[in-house]
Amino acid sequence: MIIQKGKEHLAKDKQKSNLYLRILSGIVLVPSFVVAILWLKPLFYVLMILVAIGMLSEWYDMTHSSIMYLLIGLIIIPIPISLLIFLSSNPINNWLIMLYFCIVWSVDIFAMIGGKTLGGAKLAPKISPKKTWSGLITGILSAGLVATLISFIPSFYIENYYFSNRIYLFIISCTLALTAQLSDLFISYFKRKFNIKDSGNIIPGHGGVLDRFDSIILTAPILFFINGLYL
């Protein structure tokens, strides 16, 4: 009994430590990408290319060098990142890209906080045992709120009407947040399939590059599609 309680206590301490590390990593990553997007665009391109290389490398290692899965990786990783680079090549989309990263990263952080705080039913226990429905809902609503608050910044401007209207913005942000979580589960499925917990350990609190940027896989195409509706 004492040993069991000790293990549970250590597990909780580890989870709390991972949460702090994840928040600290976000504090470093978010400003870095904001600066790159708004003022140092070549740096943003370099960062995204490095992200693509890192994701592909980890995907290759994770799937045990399987040719079939490598081909899947060559589709689901370069294409979404290319779409983000294409969108960011137009300066008028600077705020759009920055908002996008704030949404997909905030849902991840707040989903983890909500899940740890509220607990409750598991979202997909066989794929990602730690995810909960309470965390999902908390993350989605928080991401929508974060995006709405960002829209009050005086210099905030997105040409697309669906992003400049705060009601639509909240709905789109929640949609992207939900998709980000689905994208996370999508990659988690493959990690479970190949018996891997994290794709790497390069980013404290997150694991590998693929663990941190897996939300791009499904959300970037949706962002590109929605942005194109009004153009």
Swiss-Prot record:
It comes from Rickettsia bellii (strain RML369-C). It is an enzyme of class 2 (transferase). GO terms for molecular function: phosphatidate cytidylyltransferase activity. InterPro entries: PC_trans. It is found in: Cell membrane. It is a multi-pass membrane protein. PANTHER family: PHOSPHATIDATE CYTIDYLYLTRANSFERASE. It comes from the Bacteria. The chain crosses the membrane at residues 33-53, 67-87, 95-115, 133-153, 167-187, 206-226. GO terms for biological process: CDP-diacylglycerol biosynthetic process. The keyword Hydrolase does not apply. Keywords: Cell membrane, Lipid biosynthesis, Lipid metabolism, Membrane, Nucleotidyltransferase, Phospholipid biosynthesis, Phospholipid metabolism, Transferase, Transmembrane, Transmembrane helix. The keyword Phosphoprotein does not apply. It catalyses: a 1,2-diacyl-sn-glycero-3-phosphate + CTP + H(+) = a CDP-1,2-diacyl-sn-glycerol + diphosphate. GO terms for cellular component: plasma membrane. This is Phosphatidate cytidylyltransferase. Belongs to the CDS family. Its EC number is 2.7.7.41. Pathway: Phospholipid metabolism; CDP-diacylglycerol biosynthesis; CDP-diacylglycerol from sn-glycerol 3-phosphate: step 3/3.
